[in-house]
Every structure is written in structure tokens, then in C-alpha cells.
Amino acid sequence: MRLTIVAVGQKVPDWAQTAYDDYAKRFPPELKVELKAVKTEPRGSKTLENLLAAERTRIEGAIARGCRIVALDERGTAVTTMALAEHLKNWQLSGDDVAIVIGGPDGLDAGFKQSAHQRIRLSDLTLPHAMVRVLLIEQLYRAWSITINHPYHRE
């Protein structure tokens, strides 16, 4: 199974990239995790709707055909670590590749969110973009460790 994290925004602080890379390299070959960063649309004089539509086009271009799409959304379904582990297990059993999408500073296009297979939220808090990348990859690693009874996660 291939798990692709599509993130709007290319530049993150070094600490965030280091943390992301540390978790990403822990995944086994049968669960390949890839990060695809897509360019944030410059604001200029564009309406928010046009800006998000342009980012949507880039996001969709980064997602392989046939992928299950999971959008991170502040109004999405709250998930616990155990629920995320269950989702991950089900994704693996389905054999589908999965793309988890992190929106930019203005979020994700409404139509894109509606077309996603799932919408989840990581927290009720507003988090900086770089922190979301790190939090997501850590939680995915934790979820994977739960599915194989690895001692990383403790109840």
C-alpha cells in the first residue's frame, strides 16, 4: 500500500522537516509513505474561491488515479489514535492506495472536501501547517505500530 500525504505549501521550518523525515523513515517497505508538497496559490487579487480552486487543481494533479482520498478538515470527523489505526488497517486490507490531503492557509476547496472519501480532523485546535505535517506522520506511525502490536504505542 502506498500512503501519500499531499500538503499545500512547500516550505516548512527545518525542525518540522527533520521530525517528519524521522517518522517517515520508520515505516516498513510494504507501507510506503510519500510526501507531495504542492505550491500555495499566491493571493494577489484573486477571490478565495478562485485561490482554492487553483490549489485544488494542483492537489488533484498530485494524487494518483484510483487513490482513496482523505481530506483533513476542521469540521471533519474526530478520530482517536485507535480509530486511525482501524482506518489504516482497513485501508491496507482494501489494497487501495490512500492520499491524505492537508490544505493550505485557507483550507481546502469545498467541492474537493465533498468529493473526498473521508474527512477527518486531527484536533479541535488550530495548528500551524508545519505542526500538522509532523502530527499526522507521527499519528500514522503510531497507528501502524498498533496494527502490528509494536511497543511504540502504550495504553
Curated annotation (Swiss-Prot):
Which proteins does it associate with, and in what oligomeric form?
Homodimer.
Family (UniProt): Belongs to the RNA methyltransferase RlmH family.
Q: Where does S-adenosyl-L-methionine bind?
A: 72, 103, 122-127
Q: Name one GO molecular function term.
A: rRNA (pseudouridine-N3-)-methyltransferase activity
Q: Which GO terms describe its cellular component?
A: cytoplasm
Catalysed reaction(s)? pseudouridine(1915) in 23S rRNA + S-adenosyl-L-methionine = N(3)-methylpseudouridine(1915) in 23S rRNA + S-adenosyl-L-homocysteine + H(+)
Q: What is this protein called?
A: Ribosomal RNA large subunit methyltransferase H
Sorted alphabetically, which keywords does the UniProt record give? Cytoplasm, Methyltransferase, rRNA processing, S-adenosyl-L-methionine, Transferase
Q: Is Cytoplasm given among the entry's keywords? A: yes
The protein's matches in InterPro entries, at most eight in alphabetical order, are given as: Alpha/beta_knot_MTases, RlmH-like, tRNA_m1G_MTases_N
- Between which residues do disulfide bridges form? none
Stated EC number for the protein is: 2.1.1.177
Q: What class of enzyme is it?
A: transferase
Q: What does this protein do?
A: Specifically methylates the pseudouridine at position 1915 (m3Psi1915) in 23S rRNA.
Q: Which Pfam families match?
A: SPOUT_MTase
Where is it localised? Cytoplasm
Q: Which domain of life is it from?
A: Bacteria
